[in-house]
């Protein structure tokens, strides 16, 4: 049943603006970060690592979570129109599968976004005249940060499910990103730590298990809440 739900959710993305958004929007932080790097090469001397700190300074703090929120708001958009909630909750599929189907599609689109960010980073590095190739460690940081989409997506799906507005959950994600940046400065921002945002050394210092466990705990929390909300929702 879960695969049927995933297939149905993917059909909603056909001919939508989601994929153009996941291609165009990451270009903005890539340009901003590269420009910032080129203006400060006298103090940013770690080359590929320094470029990474500048691109992720903008991308992780201001674009990553709002992009996921955008994807989530779009997937709930049809349910919030007319009487589509009746159709959604009347389908012969379990509540967990309905929610997890959406989350799986969100993770898939986020993965595409992250791959594109990696490509933009490599292109930016070459345009900036950096020698050699991108350090493999940085690509690992990018992949590790992708797993944060599981918990972020679970929360944003919950918010977009409850809030009918398309833009409000995205605004909440932006505010949360800024708040998370402040928390990160105190050493507790595991999402940003996962992607190693604005760092040229591994901020987790190899403690990947803590990051993965915290991601799973937050996912489980938001999933259980969403599951209860859906069960109590009137058809």
Indicate where each model-derived feature is located:
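Pore- or pathway-lining transmembrane helices of multi-pass membrane proteins that form conduits
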Residues: 21-26, 163-181
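Aromatic- and glycine-rich beta-strand/loop motifs that create alpha-glucan
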Residues: 1-26
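Helix-loop-helix units of permease transmembrane domains in multi-pass membrane transporters
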Residues: 75-107
